[in-house]
Structure formats: structure tokens, C-alpha cells
């Protein structure tokens, strides 16, 4: 098979034609590319932790963390360092190779940057890859996080430029692209994807993929989320997306961004094992691991490992550690949970 050529000049019509392929033809093309670029049975595992929850000033209609919607979510301050490290140790011992930290902010405040920098350094010292999603970043903030050793920064485009205004009005599409440019210029790896099932049309799903695939450099990681409908948000009563359209989105992402990790992200809790298996065949090779994604449900770890065994999949190996080191990390995490200490960072005012 000839080497896959990377492209950054996809036309909307080309991507729409991929979406329109018969399912067998689409899956064959996507899986062939997937096998050429990756071990088809290896899945990268990340753990996602909300380090600051709720009270976000943005109006994203899908998000339970927006201060504008009554979703019953309790807001929390920025987590204390040891609370974060306890979660990171537990994640590594459970098999995660990357630890992702998310904060419900429009953008991080300058006063918090030194603390965030230290957080990255401390998690890196555990031997894990690191990722953060903190909202918009200036070039200076991106450089600060890069200097700390942050491996990935996540900032999703969410949907197509045309449908974007129906999803969020408090942040422009261009501001998202600017943040991705700042991240890439800093030397960090880019994690960017979107959400499907938000009432968009098929052409909008094609438009999202077009925007991602036509970035100067493809995102290193592309999370594809299925909308999780949360009571109290404007999108709580939307009709469900046909699951096969979700599989098509995964497949088209794999074809247009052949060397990127495509992450089967939010919404897995509501997916059957058979649907997830189709997504892995279509080119998904990364998941979030653990019972919660920021504030929404996710499959239990044992369920994921059981599915992996049934499908013959295996986790990507992170930095090697001994059984004794893993047991020590778990013991330290358990001991920390027993301590009567604040879970929150004193200076992290909402």
C-alpha cells in the first residue's frame, strides 16, 4: 500500500462525499489507513480530571458548567496540588498514560499561571504525559505552560463555522483558532476536535472535520464527542443522533487526519459495546478512562478493560513502572484520601 499523503487543502464537497460513501466502503478505507499508520489493536488511555468546576461565564449550550444554566452542578474552587497528584497517581496505576486537567474558565487568570505551571511539573514527575484544557490562551500563557513541560493542550472547535453561532455566542470561532495557533507556536502538541449530535446537519459535521484537517498541522489528538444531554442546558431535549453517523464521523476523521490520534470521547456511557467496537474499527484509537469526564458519566474502568479483552485490544504503554511502584502510588493515593486536608487551592477563588 502506498504511503498516506497528508493534506491541508480539503474541500467541503470532498469530505461530504466521504460521509456519503456506503458504510462498508467508508469503513474499509478508514480501517486500511488506520492499520497503515498505527497498531490497530492499541488504544491510548487518558484520564481527565476537573481541577476547577462550574461557574463558567461562557454560554455553550451543551455545557452543564456554564453559570447561565441551572443544572444542579455545585461549583468548586481550583483543586489543591495534592488532590490533583492523588488522582494522577491513581490514574497511572490504573493504566492511563496521559493525565488531562480541565478548568471551567473562559481563560486562565495570570495569578493562577505559576500554580498551573507547578501542577504540570509535578504530574510530569510521576512519569505521565500531561494535557490541560483551560479555555483561551494568550501566546505568553501558552509559552508558560510549554516551559513547564505540558505535552498537550486541548481546545475544541466544537462544530462548523456555520453552525457555531447556534452553539455559543460568548466566544468567536476565530478566538478558538487563535488559541490553537498560540499552542502550536509554543511547541506544545494540539488536541482539538468537536461535538456531534448538537442538532447540526451532516454538512456541519463535514465542516468541523474540514476545519481540523486544514489546520497548518493536523491536531496530534482529535477528540470526537457525542453530545451528553444534561438537564437544565438548552440542548437537553435534542433528538439523538443516529449512532451510525457518529461512526461515520470517526471514520472521516481517520481518513482526513491519518496520523492523528482519534479519541472516542464523551458519550461512551450511552454507547453499546457494539457501537464502540465499530468506532475502534473505523479508526478511533484513544479513550478517556475513568467513571467521569469532568462532570458527565463515563464507563467504569472494569467495563472498559472487559471490552478491551473481548475485542483483543490493549492499552498503549506509557512510561514503564514496576508493580511495586504502582502499588506504592496507589497506597500513597489512598493514604492522602484519608487525610483531613482541604481538597482546594486557597488562592483559587471562583
UniProtKB/Swiss-Prot annotation:
Cofactor names: [4Fe-4S] cluster; [2Fe-2S] cluster
Name under which the protein is recorded: Biotin synthase
Keyword Transport: no
Domain Radical SAM core: 41-268
Entry EC no(s): 2.8.1.6
Superkingdom of the source species: Bacteria
Residues that, per the record, bind [2Fe-2S] cluster: 100, 131, 191, 263
Keyword Nucleus: no
Record InterPro entries: Aldolase_TIM (IPR013785), BATS_dom (IPR010722), Biotin_synth/BioAB (IPR002684), Biotin_synthase (IPR024177), Elp3/MiaA/NifB-like_rSAM (IPR006638), rSAM (IPR007197)
Lineage: Bacteria, Pseudomonadati, Pseudomonadota, Gammaproteobacteria, Alteromonadales
Gene that specifies this protein: bioB
Amino acid at each position: 500500500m502506498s504511503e498516506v499523503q497528508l493534506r491541508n487543502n480539503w474541500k467541503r464537497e470532498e469530505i461530504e462525499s466521504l460521509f456519503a460513501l456506503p458504510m462498508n466502503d467508508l469503513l474499509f478505507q478508514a480501517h486500511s489507513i488506520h492499520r497503515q499508520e498505527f497498531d490497530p489493536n492499541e488504544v491510548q488511555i487518558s484520564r481527565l480530571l476537573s481541577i476547577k468546576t462550574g461557574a463558567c461565564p461562557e454560554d455553550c449550550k451543551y455545557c452543564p458548567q456554564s453559570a447561565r444554566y441551572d443544572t444542579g452542578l455545585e461549583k468548586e474552587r481550583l483543586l489543591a496540588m495534592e488532590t490533583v497528584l492523588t488522582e494522577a497517581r491513581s490514574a497511572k496505576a490504573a493504566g492511563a498514560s496521559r493525565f488531562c486537567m480541565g478548568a471551567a474558565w473562559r481563560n486562565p487568570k495570570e495569578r493562577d499561571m505559576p500554580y498551573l505551571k507547578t501542577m504540570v511539573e509535578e504530574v510530569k514527575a510521576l512519569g505521565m504525559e500531561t494535557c490541560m484544557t483551560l479555555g483561551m490562551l494568550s501566546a505568553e500563557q501558552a509559552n508558560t505552560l510549554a516551559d513547564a513541560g505540558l505535552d498537550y493542550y486541548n481546545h475544541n472547535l466544537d462544530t462548523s463555522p456555520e453552525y457555531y453561532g447556534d452553539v455559543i455566542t460568548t466566544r468567536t470561532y476565530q478566538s478558538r483558532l487563535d488559541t490553537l495557533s498560540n499552542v502550536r507556536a509554543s511547541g506544545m502538541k494540539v488536541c482539538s476536535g468537536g461535538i456531534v449530535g448538537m442538532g447540526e446537519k451532516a454538512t456541519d459535521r463535514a465542516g468541523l472535520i474540514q476545519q481540523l484537517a486544514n489546520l497548518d498541522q493536523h491536531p496530534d489528538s482529535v477528540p470526537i464527542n457525542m453530545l451528553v444531554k444534561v438537564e437544565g442546558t438548552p440542548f437537553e431535549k435534542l433528538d439523538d443522533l443516529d449512532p451510525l453517523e457518529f461512526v461515520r464521523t470517526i471514520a472521516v476523521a481517520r481518513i482526513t487526519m491519518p496520523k492523528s490520534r482519534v479519541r472516542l470521547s464523551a458519550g461512551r456511557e450511552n454507547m453499546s459495546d457494539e457501537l464502540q467496537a465499530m468506532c475502534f474499527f473505523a479508526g478511533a484509537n484513544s479513550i478517556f478512562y475513568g467513571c467521569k469526564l469532568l462532570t458527565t458519566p463515563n464507563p467504569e474502568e472494569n467495563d472498559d478493560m472487559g471490552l478491551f479483552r473481548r475485542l483483543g485490544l490493549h492499552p498503549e504503554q506509557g512510561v514503564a513502572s514496576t508493580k511495586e511502584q504502582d502499588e506504592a502510588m496507589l497506597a500513597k493515593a489512598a493514604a492522602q484520601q484519608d487525610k483531613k486536608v482541604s481538597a482546594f487551592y486557597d488562592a483559587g477563588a471562583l
